[in-house]
């Protein structure tokens, strides 16, 4: 199984879902080798074997991955950038490079480990391509130790393809979010091409919701017979009890997620302003980070609600649980959400939730309040109702907890196991 992140080092729902699924598969007697670009050594390996791609020796002499390499596009600067050398030494370096025709990306000489950051930085595309090269070597090193390949999201699709071509094993790709979900209609063509290539090469495509499955069929041209929906789930914990004292009497309404277009943070802010015109006994918390953060901060200031609005930055692990424990209402106003695990985590923590109708999780929840992401008035009314009418909040909390209790990773893993069996 190829992933890009694994707890406790995660940036969002992808790592959480990978963790939950691998735990669930273990309960079905399925052994999982989870390959990640960078492992830190503190991963929970009681039910999964974690392989650190940064420790894999990868000779590049084999030409079986040449087609992957040839798909890469690099912009070269016509300069040999060698630090800390005298001018005459630099001239010597430059002449040697010109004479031999060598480049920094000399694939024939790549025989050492590639140190992945495992992040989502400026060199992400290069890391995705390198990960595919390492994946091919992993498939060789582990020959005879696996029966099937499972790749999570576009970051690992090239890796899955490379491993399949080396091993001949069936490939399952897991679509957690499409490029259309992340970017609207302004898609990155490179990401789109990778997603389409992965799903085209795959023997089966798992989508996290019917919403995502339909998108895969309609926007990527993937045959309906190849796609199957397996909804995400939530892992229960003993740390989810609400505290008796919070230190504030105001109601707390929380947005937790990446502060990006996809998650609809601007709609949360506009709804907050409308609620605060009706009552001042409420505080709004935006927990997360992202490219829209500065814009959101400026908008909060312009609306004059900064004294009622709090930014926590990115939260992880126990910090997330503490935030839910402090919350009276959780809001997920996503513009396009393939699934959305965070509402399940909130309901698990006895917090009533409001979600957008444009989310996959809406397919499995009957006791969450659902609004169109763009309907700020409806969102504001829903928030106001939950903070001002205790009976409504209590009913949503009680019914929601009962509903989410049945959404277990063990059940989702059972459906994934059935997909595996259909290919073996």
Q: What are these model-derived regions, one by one?
A:
Residues 335:
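Aromatic "clamp/platform" in nucleotide-sugar-dependent glycosyltransferases that forms part
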Residues 368-376, 385-390:
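Conserved acidic donor-binding segment of nucleotide-sugar-dependent glycosyltransferases
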Residues 295-315:
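Nucleotide-activated donor-binding/catalytic signature segment of Leloir-type glycosyltransferases, i.e.
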Residues 211, 233:
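Carbohydrate-associated surface elements
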Residues 34-139:
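A conserved catalytic-core segment of Leloir-type glycosyltransferases
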Residues 314-315, 322-327:
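Short alpha-helical donor nucleotide-sugar binding micro-motif in glycosyltransferases
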Residues 206, 247-272, 285, 397:
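Conserved donor-binding/catalytic core segment of Leloir-type glycosyltransferases
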Residues 352-355:
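Short hydrophobic beta-strand element within catalytic cores of glycosyltransferases
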